[in-house]
Amino acid sequence: MYSIRKQPRNFQRKFNSNTTNRFPIRRKYVGGHTRPSVRRRLTYEPVERPLVHNVLCEKQHGDVFNLQQNTSYTSFVTYPSRGPSGDGRSRDYIKLQSMSVSGVIHAKANCNDDPMEVSHDVNGVFVFSLIMDTKPYLPAGVQALPTFEELFGAYSACYVNLRLLNNQQHRYRVLHSVKRFVSSAGDTKVSQFRFNKRLSTRRYNIWASFHDGDLVNAGGNYRNISKNAILVSYAFVSEHSMSCKPFVQIETSYVG
C-alpha cells in the first residue's frame, strides 16, 4: 500500500504567507503585456572627468624680473586651474611629472656719463633656481615671497654650490639650479640656458594639492596651493654696475 508522507507543520504557513515574495511584482497592462518594475535612483553622484596628462606653459619676463647687480626676485610656478570644461585639472590635486625650462639672459653694463668707464669688460653671475615649497603659506597682508637672502643667505652664495639655510631646510628643497657667467663692455650680451627636471619617478611620486573652496576660487596661484608649490628664484650678483633681463619659459607636465 501507499504510505502517506507527512508535511511539516509550517508548510501551509510558509506558502500561504503574503509576506514572502522573492520576485518583483510584474504589473499587467492592456493587451496582455507585462513590464518589470523599474528601480530609480533618487540621488546621483557628480561625474568627475578622469585624470589625464597635460602640459602647462608659462612665460616669466617683464619689468619686475629685471635685476640690477646684487638683487634678486622670487616668483612661483603657476599650476592649472580647476574647471568642468575639460581644461586644466579635474581634482583638488595633481601629480607633478616633469618640468622643462628654457630661457635667455640679456646682460648689459650700465653706461655712465663718461664712456671711458665702460671701455673694459664687466662681468656678473646669474642664478636661476627651482625650489620646492612643501608647506606654502603667506600671512595675511603679505605679498612678497621669500627672497634669495632669506633662503640661501648672502649673495656671495651665488659663486658656490647653493645650499639652503639650516632654518629653511624643513620646508624648502632645491630641485635644480643654473648659473651663467655673463660679461659685457657696454653692448648687450645674450646667454641661453635650458634643462629638464624629472619630478615623479616609478618609485616616488610628487603630488600637489589645493585648497579649492569652490570652483570660483580654484585657481593655480600660490595662495591656493596647500602642498608642494614650486618657487622660482632669480638672482644676479656683480661687482660692477650691470643689469640683467631674463626671459624664461617653464613647461610643467602633470596628471590631473
UniProtKB/Swiss-Prot annotation:
It comes from African cassava mosaic virus (isolate Nigerian) (ACMV). Residues 150-187 are annotated as: Interaction with Arabidopsis thaliana NSI protein. One of its GO terms (cellular component) is viral capsid. Binds to single-stranded and double-stranded viral DNA. Interacts with the host nuclear shuttle interacting (NSI) protein. This interaction may allow NSP to recruit NSI monomers to the viral genome and thus regulate nuclear export of viral genome by NSP. Its main location: host cell. A motif (Bipartite nuclear localization signal) lies at residues 18-39. It holds the Pfam family Gemini_coat. GO terms for molecular function: single-stranded DNA binding; structural molecule activity. It is found in: Host nucleus; Host cytoplasm; Host cell membrane. This is Nuclear shuttle protein. InterPro entries: Gemini_BR1, GV_A/BR1_coat, Viral_coat. Binds to the genomic viral ssDNA, shuttles it into and out of the cell nucleus. Begomoviruses use 2 proteins to transport their DNA from cell to cell. The nuclear shuttle protein (NSP) shuttles it between nucleus and cytoplasm and the movement protein (MP) probably transports the DNA-NSP complex to the cell periphery and facilitates movement across the cell wall. Gene3D superfamilies: 2.60.120.20. It is a peripheral membrane protein. Coiled coil: none annotated. Keywords: DNA-binding, Host cell membrane, Host cytoplasm, Host membrane, Host nucleus, Host-virus interaction, Membrane, Transport, Viral movement protein. The keyword DNA-binding applies. The keyword Magnesium does not apply. A motif (Nuclear localization signal) lies at residues 81-96. Belongs to the begomovirus nuclear shuttle protein family. One of its GO terms (biological process) is DNA transport.
